[in-house]
Amino acid sequence: MSLMDPLANALNHVSNCESVGKNVAYLKPASKLIGRVLNVMQDQGYIGNFEYIEDGKAGVYKVDLIGQINKCGAVKPRYAVKNHDFEKFEKRYLPAKGFGLLIVSTPKGLMTHDEARNAGVGGRLISYIY
């Protein structure tokens, strides 16, 4: 059986592991997009270290959880957003203004919605976390 959305599955697994109090989550299958999303989450202080483990198939990410995530998930469909329209999606996906972040895929790479707004670029919404 194939996964329809590996990113949504990975973020849901992280959220579930965080809610039951686990210290480590193993995300399988691994992909470049999942790795980049984990990198943004680590830069913003939501997760600890993570590492890629080769298992002879698609690979596994081992993620150290630090108890900072209340909820995270993928945005479906992946809306195209202009740099001045982020506030509408903040109201939809985040509980309060200035709390949490949206992860956006831009021509300059994956970044948070605040970084994209400051850089003056738009993109597609990938996920949310708070």
Swiss-Prot record:
Record's keyword terms, sorted: Ribonucleoprotein, Ribosomal protein, RNA-binding, rRNA-binding
Example GO molecular function: rRNA binding
First and last residue of the signal peptide: none
Entries under Gene3D superfamilies matching the protein: 3.30.1370.30, 3.30.1490.10
GO biological process annotation, one example: translation
Pfam families assigned to the protein according to its UniProt record, in alphabetical order: Ribosomal_S8 (PF00410)
Subunit structure: Part of the 30S ribosomal subunit.
Function of the molecule: One of the primary rRNA binding proteins, it binds directly to 16S rRNA central domain where it helps coordinate assembly of the platform of the 30S subunit.
PANTHER family: 40S RIBOSOMAL PROTEIN S15A
Protein name, entry field: Small ribosomal subunit protein uS8
Organism, as annotated: Methanococcus maripaludis (strain DSM 14266 / JCM 13030 / NBRC 101832 / S2 / LL)
